[in-house]
Amino acid sequence: VSQDSLALEEVTRDSFPLPTLGKKVEAWRQTIMTGTGVQVVKGLPVGQWSEAEIALAYWGIGHHLGTPGAQNPDNELLGHVKDYDEARDDPFVRLYRTNSNIRYHCDAADIVGLLCLKPAKTGGKSRVVSTGSLFNALYQRHPEWIPRLFEPIKLDRRGELIEGQKP
C-alpha cells in the first residue's frame, strides 16, 4: 500500500490488484454472498500504516468485495464510527458519531464493512446478523411471518438525503 499511489475516488478493482490476497478475498466474498453472510478478518497491519494508507487498503479491498459507495450526502467515501460528542437526543445526529449503544438496524447496502483502528476503552463492541441467515431461520420457524418482510417499511435517513432520494 502506498499513500501516494491513488486517491480513493480513483481506485477500481483493476487499479488495486491483490496478487497475494486476491484468492482469500474472493473466498471472503463467497462466504458473505452465499455462506453465513458474515466474515471476520483479522491481521491487517494498520499499526504500520498511515491513516491515508489504511483508507486506501480498506477501500481497495472493498472493491474486490463489491462496489463501494458514498456514505452520506456529502459523498464521504469512508465514515468513521467514533464519538464526536454530538447530542444523542438530536433526531438528525447519526448514532455512530456518538458513544451511544446502537441497537440492531439495517444499513442500506448489500455488504457492510467495519475496520477497527483503535479499540474503545469501554464498549465499542459490534454485533452483526446476516439478513439471509435471519430470513432462513425465520422461514423455518415461522413461515407465516415471511410475507410481512416484503411489505414497505419506514426509513429514517436522519436528514441525510442524497439529491433524488425519497425521504
Label every PLM stretch briefly:
Residues 55-69:
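A short alpha->loop->secondary-structure connector
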Residues 1-21, 26-27, 34, 39, ...:
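Active-site environment of non-heme Fe oxygenases that use a 2-His-1-carboxylate facial triad
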Residues 52-59, 128-130:
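"Short basic amphipathic alpha-helical interaction patches in structured regions
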